[in-house]
């Protein structure tokens, strides 16, 4: 089967048990040139066929290349799409991993068709991201210092085992024991050498936009270690800008970082050709920063970016604490509260504010150190025990946290905060305050309230309905291509459900 420069793309989506085809022309000249047949060898598979197979497989939640190969041999729909050619899984994997530039053109072509059908309203674009794991191990993350320490530990362990093995050479050991010891020494040496080789290839640590240190990863150094509500993952953040009219994804990017603040401006710049002067951009508090708001104002972009205190200022949510459910203990990642002190507290001492005296639980009077001592911004009276009373006291263990090192007890009775001068009020005319003022208006709340219903169902469709919940490739270039494929499946489904006008 020869390759064609123009593909009549078949959009297959399952709706009510039926497969609905939609057709339009997409130029695949670049993809054809890259997969052109050689003068020798077997004919190349047409990229049009491979793209149809991969896209339909993704729409069914089939992402692994071996699984796609299997259904091409066993499933009648895939057999029809591939023309009974049943491409090998290595061919499918190579096609997907080298598809970024080509799939970007297909994504743009499908977006143009959606625009021609009136599915892009340009009234509001909601920007958000989803953190997905990738084909990388989070256990192989660390800084150069941590990798160096691991290599030294492995080398030390290998040396210790080798010395022990040499010391027992004269003994009559079981052959299996000697073979296992030799294999373990070789494995430790190999792992240490792999770390040394990686350190030689990567002489510098990863740095963030502000110069902060970021952990590298030896399986995929472009990925990032990110915290989610389900735990820590090693992967990428898939960012999408979704139009509010029909939930069409108008821009899709993938980045190896969990910091959303640095992902806003790349999406805004990519939307410059698509949005109008009246298009509203919305994003949640993860994208809020003074630098981002200043950049949006400089670009004259109309946007509503939530700040972390937006809900606290909303009077409609004044009684939100009453409706808060108990936290799930399995997902509570906060640090446990420190245990209650087992020593005597100031309430256990007898304090006379008028006489300015203090008596400890053992009945001994304490010396007053001052009437206006300041501790952490609080003013009060401080008392100190006498050494002749505290050292031989029988209640010493119940009075001092470290009786073996502390000689006497100190206690303070605070009266209130130290009066300070009023802090200067922040400037009123800043990008942050202006954004807050817009968000706090009824119109701003109504506009921003549409963000959640616009972008979150898109991620739900991709992750749960389509089961496209992880990246199977390594390297940002390949992951961007796969994320575009994920978003392309969503857009084609939206287009098919909306109907195709003549």
Where do the model's predicted regions map?
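Aromatic-lined, polymer-binding surfaces characteristic
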Residues: 79
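Serine-centered coil/turn micro-motif
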Residues: 2, 10-16, 393, 441
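Anion-binding and metal-coordination hotspots
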Residues: 54, 61-74, 83-502
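Basic, short loop/linker segments at the boundary and entry of helix-turn-helix/winged-helix-like folds
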Residues: 8-55
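Short, flexible loop/hinge motifs at secondary-structure junctions
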Residues: 1-7, 311, 320
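Short, solvent-exposed coil/turn linker segments
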Residues: 6, 24-27, 143, 345
């Amino acid at each position: 089967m020869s390759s064609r420069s123009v593909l009549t793309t078949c959009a297959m989506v399952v709706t009510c048990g039926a497969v609905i085809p939609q057709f339009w022309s997409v130029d695949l000249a670049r993809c054809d040139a890259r997969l052109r047949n050689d003068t020798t060898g077997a004919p190349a598979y047409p990229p049009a066929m491979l793209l149809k197979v991969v896209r339909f497989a993704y729409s069914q939640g089939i992402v692994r290349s071996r699984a796609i190969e299997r259904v091409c041999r066993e499933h009648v729909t895939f057999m029809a799409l591939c023309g009974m050619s049943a491409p090998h899984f290595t061919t499918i994997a190579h096609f997907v991993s080298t598809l970024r530039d080509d799939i970007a053109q297909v994504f743009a072509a499908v977006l143009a068709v959606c625009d021609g059908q009136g599915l892009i309203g340009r009234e509001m674009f909601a920007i958000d991201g989803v953190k997905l794991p990738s084909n990388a191990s989070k256990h192989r993350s660390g800084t150069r210092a941590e990798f160096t320490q691991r290599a030294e530990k492995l080398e030390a362990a290998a040396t210790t085992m080798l010395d022990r093995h040499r010391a027992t050479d004269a003994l009559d050991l079981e052959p299996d024991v000697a073979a296992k010891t030799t294999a373990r020494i070789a494995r430790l040496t190999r792992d240490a050498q792999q770390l040394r080789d990686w350190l030689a290839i990567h002489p510098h640590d990863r740095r963030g936009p502000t110069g902060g240190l970021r952990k590298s990863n030896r399986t995929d150094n472009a990925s990032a270690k990110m915290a989610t509500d389900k735990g820590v993952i090693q992967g990428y953040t898939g960012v999408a800008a979704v139009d509010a009219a029909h939930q069409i994804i108008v821009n899709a990017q993938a980045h190896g970082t969990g910091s959303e603040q640095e992902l806003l401006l790349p999406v805004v710049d990519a939307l410059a050709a698509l949005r109008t002067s009246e298009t509203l951009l919305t994003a949640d508090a993860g994208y809020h920063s003074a630098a981002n708001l200043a950049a949006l104002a400089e670009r004259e972009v109309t946007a509503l970016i939530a700040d972390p205190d937006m809900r606290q200022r909303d009077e409609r949510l004044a009684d939100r604490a009453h409706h808060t459910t108990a936290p799930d203990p399995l997902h509570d990642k906060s640090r446990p509260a420190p245990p209650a002190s087992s020593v005597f507290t100031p309430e256990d001492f007898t304090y006379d504010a008028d006489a300015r005296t203090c008596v400890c639980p053992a009945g001994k009077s304490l010396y007053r150190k001052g009437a206006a001592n300041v501790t952490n911004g609080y003013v009060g009276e401080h008392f100190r025990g006498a050494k002749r009373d505290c050292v031989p006291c029988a209640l010493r263990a119940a009075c001092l946290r470290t009786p073996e090192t502390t000689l006497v007890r100190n206690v303070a009775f605070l009266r209130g905060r130290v009066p300070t001068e009023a802090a200067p009020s922040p400037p009123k005319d800043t990008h942050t305050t202006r954004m807050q003022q817009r968000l706090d208006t009824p119109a701003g709340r109504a506009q921003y309230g549409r963000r959640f219903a616009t972008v979150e169902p898109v991620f739900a469709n991709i992750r749960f309905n389509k089961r496209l919940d992880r990246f199977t490739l390594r390297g940002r270039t390949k992951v961007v291509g796969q994320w575009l494929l994920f978003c392309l499946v969503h857009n084609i489904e939206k287009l098919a459900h909306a109907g195709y006008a003549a």
